[in-house]
Amino acid sequence: MQNPHIPSFAQARVLVAGDVMLDRYWHGPTSRISPEAPVPVVRVTELEDRPGGAANVALNMAALGARAELVGVTGRDEAASILEERLAAAEVGCHFQKVDGLPTITKLRVISRQQQLLRLDFEEAFHSQDPAPFAEQVKQQLVHCGALVLSDYAKGALRDCPGLIALAREAGVPVLVDPKGTDFEPYRGATLLTPNLSEFEAVVGVVKDEQDLIAKGQQLIRDLDLQAMLVTRSEKGMTLLRDGLPELHLPARAREVFDVTGAGDTVISVLAVSLAAGAAMEDAVALANIAAGIVVAKLGTAVVSAPELRRAVHQEGGSGRGVMSEAQLLIAIEDARAQGERIVFTNGCFDIIHAGHVGYLDTARRQGDRLVLAVNGDESIRRLKGPGRPINPLERRMAVLAALEAVDWVVAFDTDTPEPLLESIKPDVLVKGGDYSVDQVVGHEFVKSYGGEVKVLDFIDDISTTKIVERIREKD
């Protein structure tokens, strides 16, 4: 499929309800084996606390720029206070039901040389708690939100999933569930379930092949009155299933996998935020797949930011060079500037590419680190040059220009001048070729206003597209 459309995540407000926990990390080097037992000795040099479980889902949403509200159950202890502090710093709204006498669920991981050596769980599940106060808190927050995520780790917070799903359906809010266990009946009526393959097989039995997965998944969708199911399949990617519609399979995108901790949280958070922001299901799934590829390349419970996701979507479209839309170009420029690179901008019709163009573009490229070449659209050229032009249509001109070594990015514009594009890009250097003075270059005042440079370069004498066209017509 084509690159997914990224909606405005800032417009999304999502409610997350489920099992919250604190992910604690002890980091340190290890260089010897304990004399007491055949285990490595880790000298702890760094302590780190991160929100986990449903709290990590909410944190992922906040990192994307969305507004997240979180309903969960905790103890009345230091771990709960740390969770509230970390989440408040990310502007996540916390609505915790605090229980006396029980600890906040905490998972301690010992990390050395970027490897997890040991995990210790500190928990007593909240299964004996009255679910009514939790449901009431969900009901209060639901009226302000565009999607509900149920993040189920089977720790007791989601004791009444049918009731919560009914509340959401009554409010017309889609419900996304990250399921747990061998029985998906409590999630009946949800909009979308996101089991991993192991969780899926625990319910439907061993999957023999692709067709078996599709058949069993669609049957489960009908049995549970779901709209869709997304089965995440580790290195095999993910598969979206809907009753009566063709399956959509997306291959895994991760180049390196360091840690799958929290990857499911990332998937469901991107799905929910995308749908709440108005994205189509196919786009939401594609974005979630790309985000999963980013997060598994990080160590520990991690989040994916909106700029990271935009850059990854941009990279999905190619090698980071060549013909781009304006939106793709702005992302590429943002990435280049983050590396300290200077952006050079030039523009023109480039109807018939000749030696003068090649020499000019090579010189222009040397004025900085990256060269943006803005090309007049066909209608723009007709207005400027007359009804007989262009000789070559836009797509062909851009393809040839993108193949030149000096050119990093090629983008089209349909206006008579490139000023709107200049205002979006804000290049470090504006370059124009020909017999101009700096004051005659379109956009010079704007570029100088923020400290940019404006330069005029020479074309090779006696070579121009107009002269070439005239010679061809004379011979005809």
Swiss-Prot record:
Keywords: ATP-binding, Carbohydrate metabolism, Kinase, Multifunctional enzyme, Nucleotide-binding, Nucleotidyltransferase, Transferase
Region (Ribokinase): 1-320
InterPro entries: Bifunc_HldE, Carboh/pur_kinase_PfkB_CS, Cyt_trans-like, PfkB_dom, RfaE_dom_I, RfaE_dom_II, Ribokinase-like, Rossmann-like_a/b/a_fold
E.C. code: 2.7.1.167, 2.7.7.70
Active-site residue list: 265
Catalyses which reaction(s): D-glycero-beta-D-manno-heptose 7-phosphate + ATP = D-glycero-beta-D-manno-heptose 1,7-bisphosphate + ADP + H(+); D-glycero-beta-D-manno-heptose 1-phosphate + ATP + H(+) = ADP-D-glycero-beta-D-manno-heptose + diphosphate
GO biological process: ADP-L-glycero-beta-D-manno-heptose biosynthetic process
SUBUNIT field: Homodimer.
Name of this protein: Bifunctional protein HldE
